[in-house]
């Protein structure tokens, strides 16, 4: 029988499944909507396996905090449209909450419990109702023995969910609310500037050597004496560290201060010494090579059957 576009749309609205899957389901069930819904549910696992090869570079980053610990997770989907889906957002929230009971490592979170199943299994099951390849990609956590771990979401679509998530750990015995407020400002800074490391000692030596090699080559081309070249390289490396090290960077909230100096100022409000002990920045789809899709071609393919 001929399957109308309106029938396909109705089934897609009901289930959130993909267009081609809806058309196949209706063809298999002679256009019976209820039977087609059941058919799609029955094929949920098979569909998840079939879709697993498709690139999931969209999705959401979620954060969750409890006491002196916070976590950030990334869950991918194939389209930004699905990232605005309530069911998908609920899934990311559940995964973030489940992550709080682990050490935050990607492996531990993948095996954490969500409604009686692992995070990996739960994400796979969601394919049947959401209609796209869904995948838990990565996670991280920060903890302090005393103090706070502030969180920040950039480009938020809902509370604790967005395209970029940041955690900043502040160790202090002072006022937690004041520490969290400052920590959030630092997290906003991290989101905007994307520092490479907390301190100069934390910078990857290989990255520093690469920069130094470039500076040496540039300095040699100047034709200046070796003693001048050496000072030029020292100056450029100093500037390099100022640009990539969080504590040495000009604070976005107040560029007249470095982040380290801003922390000293914040101690007055916090009421005790404070130390930034770590940060994590997770940007959605970072490092994923995204496929180019042609929606018009998808519609045309569906129309041809």
Swiss-Prot record:
Gene3D superfamilies: 1.10.286.20, DNA helicase RuvA subunit, C-terminal domain, Elongation factor Ts, dimerisation domain. The keyword Nucleotide-binding does not apply. It comes from the Bacteria. One of its GO terms (molecular function) is translation elongation factor activity. It is found in: Cytoplasm. Its main location: cytoplasm. Residues 79-82 are annotated as: Involved in Mg(2+) ion dislocation from EF-Tu. GO terms for cellular component: cytoplasm. Belongs to the EF-Ts family. This is Elongation factor Ts. The lineage of its organism: Bacteria, Pseudomonadati, Pseudomonadota, Alphaproteobacteria, Hyphomicrobiales. The gene is tsf.
């Amino acid at each position: 029988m001929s399957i109308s576009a309106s029938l396909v749309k109705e089934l897609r609205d009901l289930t959130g499944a993909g267009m081609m899957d809806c058309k196949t389901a209706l063809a298999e069930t002679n256009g019976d909507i209820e039977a087609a819904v059941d058919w799609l549910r029955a094929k949920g696992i098979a569909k998840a396996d079939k879709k697993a090869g498709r690139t999931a570079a969209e999705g959401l980053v979620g954060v969750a905090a409890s006491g002196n610990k916070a976590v950030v997770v990334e869950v991918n989907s194939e389209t930004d449209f699905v990232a605005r889906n309530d069911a998908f957002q609920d899934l990311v929230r559940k995964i973030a909450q489940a992550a709080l009971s682990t050490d935050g490592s990607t492996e531990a979170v993948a095996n954490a419990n969500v409604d009686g199943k692992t995070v990996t299994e739960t994400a796979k099951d969601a394919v049947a109702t959401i209609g796209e390849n869904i995948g838990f990609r990565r996670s991280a956590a920060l903890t302090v023995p005393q103090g706070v771990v502030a969180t920040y979401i950039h480009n938020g679509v809902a509370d604790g969910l967005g395209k970029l998530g940041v955690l900043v750990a502040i160790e202090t015995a002072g006022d937690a609310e004041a520490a969290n407020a400052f920590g959030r400002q630092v997290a906003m800074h991290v989101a905007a500037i994307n520092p490479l490391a907390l301190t100069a000692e934390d910078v990857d030596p290989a990255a520093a050597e690469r920069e130094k090699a470039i500076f040496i080559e540039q300095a040699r081309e100047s034709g200046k004496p070796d003693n001048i070249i050496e000072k030029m390289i020292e100056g450029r490396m100093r500037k390099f560290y100022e640009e990539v090290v969080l504590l040495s960077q000009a604070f976005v909230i107040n560029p007249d201060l470095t982040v380290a100096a801003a922390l000293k100022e914040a101690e007055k409000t916090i009421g005790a010494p404070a130390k930034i002990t770590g940060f994590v920045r997770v940007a959605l789809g970072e490092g994923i090579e995204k496929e180019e899709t042609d929606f018009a071609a998808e519609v045309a393919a569906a129309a041809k059957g």
